[in-house]
């Protein structure tokens, strides 16, 4: 790597050191002085608050009307059972919610492995203890699983129909984040004669539903998507003034960011110079599937979002791009 004093270094690809199944160190170097703390702090915040995951949000237990009900044959209080359910690590392969059940005949230990799942749901920590049955008692419960990010108290998810909700439906405070712990350190790095560089070391532990490398990659995608708007000032400033004069439906001149696609789908499209909705609808399904890293799941997402706006792939537009719209994704 040749380095000059008047250019900002671009770090090499991350180095991954796996410490356990759920813990790893990610090393990024070399970085300009100060960039280690800048990137480390930003990634740590996003990793802890914004990585999506799944959690149990509602529980119904036969014979239990509220959190303070006493259940004969159950060693723990109902409150302790609910706390233990919050630590069940769940992975869903598709969809945003599911309802599962658990049935256990005592005496014995009830673990996460006793939760009945289907092909779409996977319990990662099956040995996690939920409660203990001390007598020949049956425990039956229904669990609602939902997708989210960060921490959401039960009160924040209360719906307008709260007054008429089913008696015995217990709502849980939910921690959706699959990231359990993140710490970072900045060490000294050297390239050739430069000794004033940073090395960023991120130590990350997850609950097993996502590996550390994928979590860091997702956090980087989120940061990249948020920062991308700062390179789009001209686009947004002029975007409202051009459509009426062009004779083109204003919707087609909106940036693909307005479709609120996932970060991965949006980045794949931009990498192929697809910046406007008008660019996108002229592409066919076959063409999009040839896009690197854009699979059938992303294609389905794109088709559904377009359909909500009365649009579809494979449409033909005359005189596209209209005057004032540049090919590189900026309004001219």
UniProtKB/Swiss-Prot annotation:
GO biological process, one term: DNA-templated transcription
Entry's Gene Ontology cellular component terms: cytoplasm; DNA-directed RNA polymerase complex
Region ranges (Alpha N-terminal domain (alpha-NTD)): 1-234
GO molecular function: DNA binding; DNA-directed RNA polymerase activity; protein dimerization activity
Enzyme Commission identifier(s): 2.7.7.6
Gene3D superfamilies named among the record's database cross-references: 5' to 3' exonuclease, C-terminal subdomain, DNA-directed RNA polymerase, insert domain, RNA polymerase, RBP11-like subunit
Keyword Magnesium: no
Reactions it catalyzes: RNA(n) + a ribonucleoside 5'-triphosphate = RNA(n+1) + diphosphate
Stretches for region Alpha C-terminal domain (alpha-CTD): 248-332
Function according to Swiss-Prot or TrEMBL: DNA-dependent RNA polymerase catalyzes the transcription of DNA into RNA using the four ribonucleoside triphosphates as substrates.
Family per record: Belongs to the RNA polymerase alpha chain family.
NCBIfam families the record matches: PRK05182.1-2, PRK05182.2-5, rpoA
The protein, known as: DNA-directed RNA polymerase subunit alpha
Organism: Xanthomonas oryzae pv. oryzae (strain PXO99A)
Gene symbol of the encoding locus: rpoA
